[in-house]
Amino acid sequence: MSDYKFTLNLPETEFPMRGNLANREPEMLERWTKDGLYQQIRDSRIGRTPFILHDGPPYANGSIHIGHSVNKILKDIIVKSKTMSGFDAPYVPGWDCHGLPIELKVEQKVGKPGQKISAAEFREECRKYAAEQVDGQRADFIRLGVLGDWQKPYLTMDFATEANIVRSLSKVIENGHLHKGVKPVHWCTDCGSALAEAEVEYEDKTSPAIDVAFTATDSKALAAQFGVSDYSHPVAMVIWTTTPWTLPANRALSISPELDYSLVEFAKEGATHAVILADVLVEACMTRYGAESHSVLGKVKGVALELVRFKHPFLAFDVPAILGDHVTTDAGTGVVHTAPGHGQDDFVVGQKYGLEVANPVGDNGVYKPDTEFFAGQHVFKANDNVVALLKEKGALLHHVAYRHSYPHCWRHKTPIIFRATPQWFISMDNQNLRKQALSEIEQTQWIPDWGQSRIEKMVENRPDWCISRQRTWGVPITLFVHRETEELHPDSVSLMARVANRIEQEGIQAWWDLDAAELLGEEAEQYRKVTDTLDVWYDSGSTFASVVGARPEFHGHGVDLYLEGSDQHRGWFMSSLMISTAMTGKAPYKQVLTHGFTVDGKGRKMSKSIGNVIAPQQVTNKLGADILRLWVAATDYSGEMTVSDEILNRSADAYRRIRNTARFLLANLNGFDPAKDLVAVEDMVALDRWAVRRAAALQQEIIEAYEQYNFHIVTQKLMQFCSVELGSFYLDIIKDRQYTAKQEGHARRSCQSALFHIAEAMVRWIAPILSFTADEVWQLLPGQRDAYVFTQEWYQDLQSITLDTDLSDAYWENLLTVRNEVNKVIEQARRDKRIGGSLDAEVTLFADAALTEQLTHIGDELRFVLLTSEAKVLPLADATSDAVETELASLKLEVNATTAEKCERCWHHREEVGTIEAHPTLCHRCVTNIEGDGEVRLFA
């Protein structure tokens, strides 16, 4: 017996079956860095149309978490796919480097500025700490396979960026959007600073809910307004509040002009009380107060009570009833306790009536020394003392512990207060900023589209933006204010330009070191330097100008895309929109894409206390970054993104399917040189031409999905192609031809040409997602090529040719369906132990006329499609009793074990085996492939 094994074209490749990604990816990263891969990509796109994705800067504090990974991987997929589409798509990563969290970390190390360390030294320590944090996060991001300008990222603490932030503020001022005011702002007593909207979280809190009586200064006259003459009891208006500590700042009682208000007399414990309440709430209030009996003495509209005076319950002054649109009857009494220094609505309505904006509370949440009754007490601890004083004064009608949603500091997780302080604001309405921003929102594409209505509502309802902070580590608000008039210096814009030039050379410390006389000369005595710093949301929100507008690789093109988590509608998307519109009248972006948050397999937020945190570092060390990247791409990011060990293992299974497909392609391109072996598409075997045509159609679908940022559709189509069209059909069928046909013959080279085209296309399809694996495939593909797939464009040689004589795509799809039915019957025969494998079978297909015409069209090559040694087609009417019905009404099948001898080389059972004297163990086909010109295949 001859050894025919050496006459077979066995698959061979250096591409291993196991990816071993956790170990191999770092080796690839070293090569990428050594070769300057990112710069190679940049050089390959010189002069092309730019596509600018601007990186929203993560905060330079702590290790990256799974949410960071999702964000960076999505950005990387977009940048790489846009590059593949021919764009010049630079990616400059950035970091947010100023602000309180860094200050707090540095304080733990060196103490607060002014104690053991000067403010200048403290800032330098903050700068060092932020740089260390950037280094740690950068290494983790690079490990994910994210390509970018990692050696020259943008940092908001770079001197040039700090200077540009100041320049952007000067433009906002020049355009008339800045004003100073005393306004209630979110204030964290632990931070000792104002908070931005985006720094506020809502959590449940238990507060004292109290009903407080404000007695009228002239009860008899007030009762008369309700139609009750000569009334002898004191009449009180009742408020309901959950912040007793704000009562020292009360300056009015707000009522609704349109509501009906009732004068109610009720008896309790032998005493008679007369109170004014919203009519619709009378019954609820009487129940709450434990009234033994009550009667409504009269009703009036709220507007009739405007400016009636009431005595403060424990301070020696009286306050007016005023009209406010913010009054509701959802809870309480229909009368709102109004403290303009401690509430936004209170402040707005107070401005209309010229009320004092009283703020008896210091930065640390403690009442100031001149606060009667409560000086030196912390506001939240004073709540009980306020309640006790009200009880003592006879003004407390009801008191209960009340659980409700309350604003908390996102850093300290502690309750915050509204507190009026002198601050700098960007006005939403003075120069029509709100109106302009809403108009720009309409010009922007929001993905998903619900993002538009979300940010519109936020802009419609947001107050002026308080951009000042009382911090040490931040970009200074570089203004000079007149010591007496508090007016800005008339040359503020030009002065800021000179200060910015200094900051560009020396950093923000230049402002603190600056002697005002250097810039103002003799005027210096009349002006003081502002010591406030900018809200860090201003830092990041101005980077479209301070970074994108300044760095040469962006070509002054402007930003095409912002991409962040859905919490950034009120964060970075909002601050960027406000600053850009204030500076230029235009939005800073053309598209805004948001992704959901990561949750565990049960839909819960990641939490160390629950123990469900999945660290990206652990995933890359165990499974590899490509598995994490595949999970990100395969997940519909428009909603919550579910991740768990089980889900990642499923991604690893999906990855193996793609890897195995790539390995099959490479292994079967062994010995193929496209320069001399490539068969023109029009000369290919019909099935090969179909495979190329199918790949061409799929490539269009994949490119479209990339363009629409639908990466989960890319992965779905890729998996379908690998598993069904290739794995279960095309690759399965061609194995016989690939392994047994003449090595240099047309039948094999046709097949290899199709595999080559598919591999060239597929390596590009996967490159944005499975970047490491794509690089690995690229290095092993035959033919002359550039060093990296990442400098390429989508494969152009997938010619979708259909010849007049060709079988249609529908034909092959029908054949795939028939093949699936045949496989079911063969599998049953194998389970019944009637045959060993499919090549041990002879199949008879009983088909109707239409199907018979299709099946017989490819003649004897039908058996190669069905992977059987023999395939006969007979009329459906001739079906035997042993024939098995299929899911196709037009087809019945009969499978029998073949009686023919088995060819030693191809394993097909053929009648002629044993009849060829020189090769008694071979079939005719194999002899032709060994000694002749090779078999002829037309169809499969």
From Swiss-Prot:
A GO MF label: ATP binding
Enzyme class, spelled out: ligase
Cellular compartments per GO CC: cytosol
Keywords from the named record: Aminoacyl-tRNA synthetase, ATP-binding, Cytoplasm, Ligase, Metal-binding, Nucleotide-binding, Protein biosynthesis, Zinc
GO BP terms: isoleucyl-tRNA aminoacylation
Span(s) of short sequence motif 'KMSKS' region: 605-609
CDD domains, A to Z: Anticodon_Ia_Ile_BEm (cd07960), IleRS_core (cd00818)
Main location: cytoplasm
Transmembrane segments: none
Binding site for L-isoleucyl-5'-AMP: 564
Enzyme Commission code(s) on record: 6.1.1.5
SUPFAM superfamilies: Anticodon-binding domain of a subclass of class I aminoacyl-tRNA synthetases (SSF47323), Nucleotidylyl transferase (SSF52374), ValRS/IleRS/LeuRS editing domain (SSF50677)
Protein residues bound to Zn(2+): 903, 906, 923, 926
Family matches, as InterPro entries: aa-tRNA-synth_I_CS, aa-tRNA-synth_Ia, Anticodon_Ile_BEm, Ile-tRNA-ligase, Ile-tRNA-ligase_type1, Ile-tRNA_ligase, M/V/L/I-tRNA-synth_anticd-bd, Rossmann-like_a/b/a_fold
Keyword Cell membrane: no
Pfam families, alphabetized: Anticodon_1 (PF08264), tRNA-synt_1 (PF00133), zf-FPG_IleRS (PF06827)
Subunit details: Monomer.
Database matches in NCBIfam families: ileS
Domain comment (free text): IleRS has two distinct active sites: one for aminoacylation and one for editing. The misactivated valine is translocated from the active site to the editing site, which sterically excludes the correctly activated isoleucine. The single editing site contains two valyl binding pockets, one specific for each substrate (Val-AMP or Val-tRNA(Ile)).
Functional summary from the UniProt entry: Catalyzes the attachment of isoleucine to tRNA(Ile). As IleRS can inadvertently accommodate and process structurally similar amino acids such as valine, to avoid such errors it has two additional distinct tRNA(Ile)-dependent editing activities. One activity is designated as 'pretransfer' editing and involves the hydrolysis of activated Val-AMP. The other activity is designated 'posttransfer' editing and involves deacylation of mischarged Val-tRNA(Ile).
UniProt protein name: Isoleucine--tRNA ligase
